Structure formats: structure tokens, C-alpha cells
């Protein structure tokens, strides 16, 4: 195989293996795909591990983008620096990093994590701390972190910040996190900080939540956004209403209470770049969101360095690219609960 060399880089292959959308929008493995371009504000990363998210199978089905590489969350090794990144001295070739990219992107089709090499925005890439392995770093990723940044701070408008939570900055606010999940995951969500968990299978789940919150629940994030989850969320919201943050597009006819204000959040908008998706998911470039996102990621880096950013329990799926295809099907058919699927692509631990 021929090899090429970028500025500030090690010797690299001319082509790589990726999972991309074919001409019909279906995900397929291609073994002779070119390496992505190294833009001035980017890092070229050799991917060692990837995490699989529900959006990874949904993107190709809902937003066909023939030729686009799929996948978002990754961990790996820096092998080349963009010219602007090189000047800052913030990253070095050989460093271990993790983050999230916009996979299946019709505007930037080579930027997806299901690849041996990817191009990552340096401002939205974490340095992996010494105590953490790359397998766990892939579970940190960046997709969920970016989504929660927009959901908590922008959509719900919660006070405080990740490193200065409410209570430390303003005694007027008391935020009590609760969760809705399967009973088998009660201990897991409580270990992450939920003070109370409720069984979504229970026919009295909404009433139980209203009783526990004294009918004052005012902020809800719904990551599933199906008819039954929206009905539960709207029924559980307190008498005075509040903000409902949907991580999927919602049906207007299910917005049954005027005092509840719904909003759709698309996590990749935090990059500040145009999101060229339809069905309500798209957005124009937004410098304000990018500035917020950069600050949010810097705070997350501080939490990561301090060991205060927890990941889901990891479940490794073997088989490299075949393993990714298997993992996507596992998520699509709802075979995964309370775990993050991870696939090893490289040789590092």
C-alpha cells in the first residue's frame, strides 16, 4: 500500500477501511476509502476504539447521504495536526484523544468515526487523562456531552455550570435529578446522581413522579421521543408546566399542555457549523453556539481530568468493522440496556 505524509505527521496509508452509506443510503464496509483532508483547525486521528450510538443507525435510514462515512464517538491517537492547531501547541502528534464528530454528514462526508482515520475539530476534542484507557475514553466520546450541553444550558436554561453547579453559586436554586428507567437499572442511575428512579413500565409512573416532586417538576429531557414517552413526560410535568427538551423530532399533536414548552435539540449543532438535515433537525451555522460549545468542552475536560466524568458500563463487541455492523443491529433491535457498545479498531489498549 502506498503511503503519504502530511505536515506535522507520521507516515500514513493512502487509503483506509470505513463504514459509509452506499448509493442507496445503506451502510456498507469499504476498504479503499481515501483519508480525510486535514483542515487548519483539525486533527487527524488514528481511530483505536469507537462507541456506537442510536443515531449511528438512524442517520442512514432517515437522512440518506450516499458516500458519507457514518459514526460519531471515538478514541485514538493524533497522527497529524492542522496548521492552526500546530501553532497553538495544545495538541501533539502521538497524544491520546477522544471526542465526537458529525457522522453521515452530507456537507462533510469524510468526517465519520467508523473509519481507521478521522478528522476532528480540535476545539471539540478531549485529551485522554492518564488514568483512563482508550476503551473507556471512547465511551466518553463527545456526542452525548455536546447534546447535554445544549439540552441543559440552552434548551432547559438551567442555572450554574458543570464545574460550578447550583447550590454552590446561588442558594435560591435547588435542582433534584430524577430518572425514569427499567427497575434493573435503578442502581446504575442512582450511582450517577439520580436521587430517585421510577419504573416506566408502571401504569402509575406519571402520578408517582408528580407525588414525589409535589407537582413541581419543571424540566424534562426525553431522549426517546415516542408517543408513550411524550405522554409520560407531559403527564409528569408539574401543574405550572415547564420545559420539555426532546432529543428526537416530536409530533405537535402530542404537545397536549400549553404550559409545557417543547424544544428539539440536535447535539451536533454545538459545533456551530451548518447542520444540513431535514425533518426539523437542520440548522444554520451559529457562532454563538460554537462559542458556548468551546467553553462547555473546556469545562468537561476539567471534569474528565479530575475523574468526575462517569461513563456507561462498557460492552465490547468484537470483529472490528463487522462488529460495528453487528452493534448497530443490536441497538436497532433494542438488545442493549444500561451499556455502551464499544468496538476496537486499532491495536492500542
Swiss-Prot record:
Q: What class of enzyme is it?
A: oxidoreductase
Pfam families membership: ADH_N
The record's section on InterPro entries has: ADH-like_N, GroES-like_sf, NAD(P)-bd_dom_sf, PKS_ER, Trans-enoyl_RdTase-like
- TM stretches of this protein: none
EC number(s) for this protein?
1.-.-.-
Give the record's keywords alphabetically: NADP, Nucleotide-binding, Oxidoreductase, Virulence
User: What Gene Ontology molecular-function terms does this entry list?
Assistant: nucleotide binding; oxidoreductase activity, acting on NAD(P)H
Superkingdom per UniProt: Eukaryota
UniProt-annotated binding residues for substrate: 143-150, 267-271
Q: Which cysteines are joined by disulfide bonds?
A: none
**Annotated binding of NADP(+), by residue:** 55-58, 182-185, 200, 247-248, 336-337
Pathway field of the UniProt record reads: Mycotoxin biosynthesis
> Main role?
Trans-enoyl reductase; part of the gene cluster that mediates the biosynthesis of the mycotoxins phomacins, leucine-derived cytochalasans with potent actin polymerization-inhibitory activities and monocot-specific antigerminative activities. The first step in the pathway is catalyzed by the hybrid PKS-NRPS phmA, assisted by the enoyl reductase phmE, that are responsible for fusion of the leucine precursor and the polyketide backbone to produce a 2-pyrrolidone intermediate.
| Record's subunit section | Monomer.
Return the similarity comment.
Belongs to the zinc-containing alcohol dehydrogenase family.
Q: What is this protein called?
A: Trans-enoyl reductase phmE
Amino acid at each position: 500500500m502506498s503511503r503519504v505524509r502530511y505536515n506535522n505527521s507520521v507516515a500514513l496509508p493512502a487509503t483506509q477501511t470505513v463504514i459509509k452509506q452506499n448509493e442507496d443510503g445503506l451502510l456498507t464496509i469499504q476498504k479503499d476509502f481515501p483519508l480525510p483532508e486535514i483542515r487548519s483547525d483539525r486533527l487527524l486521528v488514528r481511530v483505536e476504539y469507537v462507541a456506537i450510538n442510536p443515531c449511528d443507525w438512524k442517520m442512514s435510514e432517515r437522512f440518506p447521504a450516499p458516500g458519507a462515512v457514518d459514526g460519531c464517538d471515538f478514541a485514538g491517537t493524533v497522527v497529524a495536526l492542522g496548521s492552526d492547531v500546530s501553532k497553538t501547541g495544545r495538541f501533539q502528534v502521538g497524544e491520546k484523544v477522544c471526542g465526537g464528530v458529525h457522522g453521515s454528514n452530507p456537507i462533510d462526508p469524510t468526517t465519520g468515526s467508523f473509519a481507521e482515520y478521522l478528522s476532528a475539530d480540535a476545539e471539540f476534542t478531549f485529551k485522554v487523562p492518564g488514568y483512563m484507557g482508550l476503551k473507556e475514553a471512547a465511551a466518553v466520546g463527545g456526542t452525548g456531552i455536546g447534546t447535554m450541553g445544549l439540552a441543559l444550558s440552552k434548551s432547559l436554561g438551567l442555572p450554574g455550570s458543570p464545574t460550578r453547579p447550583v447550590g454552590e453559586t446561588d442558594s435560591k436554586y435547588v435542582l433534584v435529578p430524577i430518572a425514569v428507567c427499567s427497575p434493573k437499572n435503578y442502581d446504575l442511575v442512582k450511582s450517577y446522581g439520580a436521587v430517585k428512579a421510577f419504573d416506566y413500565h408502571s401504569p402509575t409512573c406519571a402520578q408517582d413522579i408528580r407525588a414525589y416532586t409535589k407537582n413541581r417538576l419543571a424540566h424534562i429531557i426525553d431522549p426517546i421521543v415516542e408517543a408513550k414517552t411524550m405522554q409520560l413526560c407531559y403527564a409528569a410535568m408539574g401543574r405550572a408546566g415547564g420545559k420539555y427538551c426532546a432529543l428526537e423530532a416530536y409530533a405537535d399533536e402530542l404537545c397536549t399542555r400549553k404550559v409545557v414548552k417543547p424544544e428539539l435539540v440536535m447535539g451536533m449543532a454545538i459545533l456551530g457549523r451548518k447542520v444540513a438535515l431535514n425533518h426539523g433537525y437542520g440548522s444554520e451555522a451559529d457562532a454563538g453556539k460554537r462559542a458556548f460549545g468551546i467553553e462547555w468542552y473546556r469545562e468537561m475536560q476539567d471534569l474528565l481530568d479530575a475523574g468526575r466524568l462517569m461513563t456507561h458500563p462498557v460492552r465490547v463487541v468484537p470483529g472490528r468493522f463487522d462488529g460495528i455492523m453487528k452493534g448497530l443491529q443490536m441497538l436497532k433491535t433494542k438488545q442493549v440496556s444500561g451499556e455502551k457498545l464499544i468496538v476496537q479498531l486499532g491495536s492500542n489498549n
